[in-house]
């Protein structure tokens, strides 16, 4: 379940890399973002051929393997009395589910984010369903770099409410535990991931593409973004088996 998926093509890249993968992929984004995405898929035969059937609407797509939900994510927060939650076709409440947020939830108020996650873990999914989450967000708002970043964004009327609420890796871990991901809650900044997870061959490949002359500036930038991942095992330890040994930053 990819939140605020935008123009991301991960579903198609996964199909290319793992053609036999048993996967049901969901994306949620504003209709203004899903409209050009579906139009792009329809224009390109290489993408269109990977769908089980052609899109029948301009902003949404639903099939047994790929789903694009044209929704305001905030509509999944605690609904008003008498207002039902949106339907998410083809979301099986019993299948192990991974929720992805790459610079999406950071734009919402923390209480709204908590409500959205709770809606997934208690309404759309059964409480016994193995469920996990991966967040990619900025951190460290209070040092010089962080203050400058916030100031620059505010000049464009952009605010990141969760940045100051969860400023460090420990805060991100506690956040995930508070969401109910009690079997695992880990985090690492992207500098750690670059140095510890990425092979030397891959680093050399990227360096040749990007011409990374200012390594210190890169590392400063990487320290201000993080991945946080958490899970609940439910009826199965599928995520503990998959992620239990993934090295985090301590």
Please place each PLM-identified region on the residue numbering.
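Conserved beta-strand/loop positions that form the S-adenosyl-L-methionine
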Residues: 1-4
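Alpha-helical subdomain
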Residues: 10-250
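Active-site alpha-helical segments that house and flank conserved acidic catalytic motifs
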Residues: 7
């Amino acid at each position: 379940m990819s939140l605020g998926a935008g123009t991301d093509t991960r579903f198609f890249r996964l199909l290319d890399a793992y053609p036999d993968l048993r996967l049901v992929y969901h994306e949620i984004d504003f209709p203004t973002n899903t409209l050009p995405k579906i139009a792009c898929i329809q224009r390109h035969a290489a993408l269109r051929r990977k769908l089980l059937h052609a899109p029948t609407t301009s902003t949404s797509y639903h099939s047994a393997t790929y789903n694009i939900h044209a929704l305001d994510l905030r509509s999944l927060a605690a609904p008003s009395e008498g207002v039902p939650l949106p339907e998410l076709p083809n979301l099986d409440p019993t299948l192990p589910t991974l929720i992805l947020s790459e610079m999406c939830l950071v734009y919402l108020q923390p209480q709204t984010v908590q409500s959205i996650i709770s809606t997934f873990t208690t309404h759309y999914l059964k409480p016994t369903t193995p469920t996990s989450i991966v967040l990619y967000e900025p951190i460290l708002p209070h040092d010089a770099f962080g203050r400058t970043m916030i100031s620059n964004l505010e000049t464009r009327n952009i605010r990141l409410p969760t940045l100051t609420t969860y400023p460090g890796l420990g805060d991100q871990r506690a956040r995930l535990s508070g969401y109910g991901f009690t079997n695992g809650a880990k985090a690492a900044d992207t500098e750690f991931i670059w140095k510890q997870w990425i092979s030397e061959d891959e680093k050399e490949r990227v360096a040749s593409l990007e011409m990374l002359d200012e390594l210190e500036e890169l590392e400063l930038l990487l320290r201000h973004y993080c991945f946080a991942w958490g899970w609940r095992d439910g009826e199965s330890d599928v995520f503990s088996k998959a992620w239990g040994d993934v090295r985090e930053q301590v």
